């Protein structure tokens, strides 16, 4: 279990309160699909994913990105119990979607941190980045929990 300090929790919740989930979620998932094209196989029902511009403009990518980033809101509100907060999603990705748990560590969290940094600019200080990277790592661990 990952422990968050009061300062880290404050940093994370303060920034999260300013996040435009719809815009940021779509951008983060779009970047994931562009940078890691093998992940597109999990989204074969999304239609045209043939180019970066097609992906970034795809309404299904945007909608699912919003859904994914909304689940990150669960992480923000349940930092002290991520394993239980993500138990259902972990089971879904393990038992039904068969997503390799390595994908949780390598891909989505990094894209989200990059997109947050892009959107918040100077406000995304090294301390903010460190807190968010810690949260993303903890979410990856929670998402991979049912695989063990």
UniProtKB/Swiss-Prot annotation:
<comment type="similarity">
    <text>Belongs to the globin family.</text>
</comment>
<dbReference type="InterPro" id="IPR000971">
    <property type="entry name" value="Globin"/>
</dbReference>
<dbReference type="InterPro" id="IPR050056">
    <property type="entry name" value="Hemoglobin_oxygen_transport"/>
</dbReference>
<dbReference type="GO" id="GO:0005833">
    <property type="term" value="C:hemoglobin complex"/>
</dbReference>
<keyword id="KW-0408">Iron</keyword>
<dbReference type="InterPro" id="IPR002337">
    <property type="entry name" value="Hemoglobin_b"/>
</dbReference>
<comment type="subunit">
    <text>Heterotetramer of two alpha chains and two gamma chains in fetal hemoglobin (Hb F).</text>
</comment>
<protein>
    <recommendedName>
        <fullName>Hemoglobin subunit gamma</fullName>
    </recommendedName>
</protein>
<dbReference type="GO" id="GO:0019825">
    <property type="term" value="F:oxygen binding"/>
</dbReference>
<dbReference type="GO" id="GO:0072562">
    <property type="term" value="C:blood microparticle"/>
</dbReference>
<dbReference type="GO" id="GO:0043177">
    <property type="term" value="F:organic acid binding"/>
</dbReference>
<dbReference type="GO" id="GO:0031720">
    <property type="term" value="F:haptoglobin binding"/>
</dbReference>
<keyword id="KW-0561">Oxygen transport</keyword>
<keyword id="KW-0479">Metal-binding</keyword>
<feature type="binding site" description="distal binding residue">
    <location>
        <position position="64"/>
    </location>
    <ligand>
        <name>heme b</name>
    </ligand>
</feature>
<dbReference type="GO" id="GO:0046872">
    <property type="term" value="F:metal ion binding"/>
</dbReference>
<dbReference type="InterPro" id="IPR012292">
    <property type="entry name" value="Globin/Proto"/>
</dbReference>
<dbReference type="GO" id="GO:0020037">
    <property type="term" value="F:heme binding"/>
</dbReference>
<dbReference type="GO" id="GO:0042744">
    <property type="term" value="P:hydrogen peroxide catabolic process"/>
</dbReference>
<dbReference type="GO" id="GO:0004601">
    <property type="term" value="F:peroxidase activity"/>
</dbReference>
<keyword id="KW-0813">Transport</keyword>
<dbReference type="GO" id="GO:0031721">
    <property type="term" value="F:hemoglobin alpha binding"/>
</dbReference>
<feature type="domain" description="Globin">
    <location>
        <begin position="3"/>
        <end position="148"/>
    </location>
</feature>
<feature type="binding site" description="proximal binding residue">
    <location>
        <position position="93"/>
    </location>
    <ligand>
        <name>heme b</name>
    </ligand>
</feature>
<keyword id="KW-0349">Heme</keyword>
<dbReference type="InterPro" id="IPR009050">
    <property type="entry name" value="Globin-like_sf"/>
</dbReference>
<comment type="function">
    <text>Gamma chains make up the fetal hemoglobin F, in combination with alpha chains.</text>
</comment>
<dbReference type="GO" id="GO:0031838">
    <property type="term" value="C:haptoglobin-hemoglobin complex"/>
</dbReference>
<dbReference type="Pfam" id="PF00042">
    <property type="entry name" value="Globin"/>
</dbReference>
<dbReference type="GO" id="GO:0005344">
    <property type="term" value="F:oxygen carrier activity"/>
</dbReference>
């Amino acid at each position: 279990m990952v422990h968050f300090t009061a300062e880290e929790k404050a940093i994370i919740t303060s920034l999260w309160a300013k996040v435009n989930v719809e815009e940021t979620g779509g951008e983060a998932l779009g970047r994931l699909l562009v940078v890691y094209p093998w992940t597109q196989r999990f989204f074969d029902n999304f239609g045209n994913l043939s180019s970066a511009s097609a992906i970034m403009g795809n309404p299904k990518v945007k909608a699912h990105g919003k859904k994914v980033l909304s689940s990150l809101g669960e992480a923000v509100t349940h930092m002290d119990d991520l394993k239980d907060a993500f138990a259902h999603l972990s089971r879904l990705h393990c038992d039904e979607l068969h997503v390799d748990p390595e994908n949780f560590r390598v891909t989505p969290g990094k894209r989200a941190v990059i997109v947050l940094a892009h959107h918040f600019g100077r406000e995304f200080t090294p301390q903010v980045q460190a807190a968010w990277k810690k949260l993303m790592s903890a979410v990856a661990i929670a998402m991979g929990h049912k695989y063990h």
